[in-house]
C-alpha cells in the first residue's frame, strides 16, 4: 500500500462558524504538510477523518478552501488515502450521506468508505452499528482509523468513559493502531492517537504537540511526529504572569485568555489588549475577571 506515508487527521474545515481565519490556517497547514512529506520522501498521504466540522451543511467559502486543498493533496502524492470521521457524516449510524465523497473525483485521491485491507495495512472509516465487532478479525499489522476508545483523553482534562463497545484489547493482531478523533496526541501500548492538525480552541491550551506523523513502513521504523511550528496557539495565563513574561510568553497567532489577578481599570485593560495585539501579532486577548473565572471553574 505504501513505503513511506505522511499522516494527519482532524483538521475540521469550517470550524468556528466557517471562520475565514480558521480555513486559512487549514490551507496553510496543508501547504506545510505537503512540504514536510516531500522533504521526508513520503510517496503516500493518509488522512484519518474529520475533514469538515459541520455535520449538517457546507458553507461555500469552506467548500472553496476544501477543494483547493484536496487538489493540492491529489497532486502532491502518488496516492492520497482519505476516510471519514464522525464529523464528516450526516447520520450517526450510517456513512452513505457525507460531506467528502466528492473527493473521489479529484485525481490522486482515493476515498475509502468501507473497511479496506491491502498487504499488512488496513484503513477503517468511522465505525457504525455493529461494525466494531469486525475489528478482531482484521489481521493487518498497521491499522488506521477514527476510533472512540475508552480511557484515552478527549482533551487535556476529560477521559473517555467505557460504553461497552470497541476497546483497545480488540486490536489483537495489530502492532500499530493510528487513530484520529481525540485531539490530544497520546499513546497507550500499540494505540496511537495522532492529535489534531493544529490547536483549535482553549481545550488545546498549552499543548502545541500537533501536526503530522511519518511512518517509514519500508524500513520497519517507529512513527515520527512533526509539530507544525506556525500553528495557532492557545494560552490561559494570569495578568501578573503576562506582564512579567510577555517577551517570552506571547507568540504570533496566539489566543490569550487572561485571568485578572491584579486590579486594573477599563482604560488599562483596553491599553493592554491593544498593545499586545499590535506589538506581538496576537489574534485575541480575552480578559476574564476573577468572579467570572470562579463561575467557569464551577461549571467544569
Which ranges hold each PLM region?
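Conserved beta-sheet core of the metallophosphoesterase superfamily
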Residues: 156-222
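Active-site environment of divalent metal-dependent phosphoester hydrolases
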Residues: 12-16, 53-56, 83-94, 128-131, ...
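Short, conserved loop/helix-junction motifs that constitute active-site signature segments
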Residues: 73-76, 136-139, 168-173, 249-251
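Conserved catalytic scaffold of divalent metal-dependent phosphoesterases
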Residues: 66, 84-169, 194-197, 218-219
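Core catalytic region of metal-dependent phosphoesterases/phosphodiesterases
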Residues: 4, 11, 15-116, 170-174
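Short, well-ordered alpha-helix to beta-strand connector turns
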Residues: 42, 77, 119, 138-140, ...
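Accessory, non-catalytic peripheral segments of nucleic-acid enzymes
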Residues: 216-300
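Divalent metal-coordination and catalytic microenvironments
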Residues: 10, 30, 45, 50, ...
Amino acid at each position: 500500500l505504501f513505503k513511506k506515508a505522511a499522516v494527519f487527521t482532524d483538521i475540521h474545515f469550517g470550524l468556528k462558524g466557517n471562520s475565514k481565519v480558521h480555513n486559512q490556517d487549514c490551507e496553510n497547514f496543508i501547504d506545510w504538510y505537503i512540504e514536510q512529506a516531500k522533504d521526508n520522501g513520503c510517496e503516500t498521504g493518509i488522512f484519518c477523518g474529520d475533514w469538515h466540522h459541520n455535520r449538517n451543511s457546507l458553507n461555500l467559502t469552506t467548500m472553496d478552501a476544501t477543494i483547493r486543498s484536496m487538489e493540492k493533496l491529489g497532486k502532491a502524492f502518488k496516492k492520497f488515502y482519505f476516510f471519514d470521521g464522525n464529523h464528516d457524516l450526516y447520520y450517526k449510524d450510517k456513512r452513505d450521506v457525507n460531506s467528502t465523497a466528492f473527493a473521489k473525483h479529484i485525481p490522486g485521491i482515493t476515498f475509502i468508505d468501507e473497511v479496506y485491507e491491502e498487504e499488512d495495512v488496513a484503513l477503517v472509516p468511522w465505525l457504525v452499528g455493529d461494525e466494531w465487532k469486525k475489528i478482531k478479525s482484521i489481521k493487518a499489522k498497521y491499522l488506521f482509523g477514527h476510533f472512540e476508545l475508552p480511557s484515552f483523553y478527549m482533551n487535556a482534562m476529560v477521559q473517555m468513559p467505557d460504553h461497552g463497545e470497541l476497546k483497545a484489547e480488540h486490536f489483537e493482531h495489530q502492532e500499530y493502531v493510528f487513530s484520529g478523533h481525540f485531539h490530544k496526541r497520546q499513546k497507550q501500548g500499540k494505540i496511537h492517537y495522532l492529535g489534531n492538525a493544529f490547536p483549535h480552541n482553549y481545550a488545546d491550551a498549552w499543548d502545541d504537540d500537533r501536526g503530522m506523523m511519518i511512518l517509514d513502513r519500508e524500513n520497519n521504523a517507529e512513527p515520527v511526529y512533526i509539530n507544525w511550528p506556525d500553528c495557532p496557539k492557545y494560552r490561559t495565563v494570569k495578568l501578573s504572569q503576562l506582564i512579567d513574561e510577555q517577551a517570552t510568553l506571547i507568540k504570533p497567532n496566539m489566543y490569550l485568555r487572561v485571568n485578572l489577578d491584579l486590579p486594573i481599570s477599563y482604560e488599562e485593560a483596553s491599553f493592554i489588549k491593544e498593545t499586545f495585539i499590535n506589538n506581538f501579532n496576537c489574534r485575541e486577548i480575552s480578559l476574564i475577571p476573577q468572579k467570572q473565572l470562579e463561575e467557569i471553574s464551577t461549571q467544569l
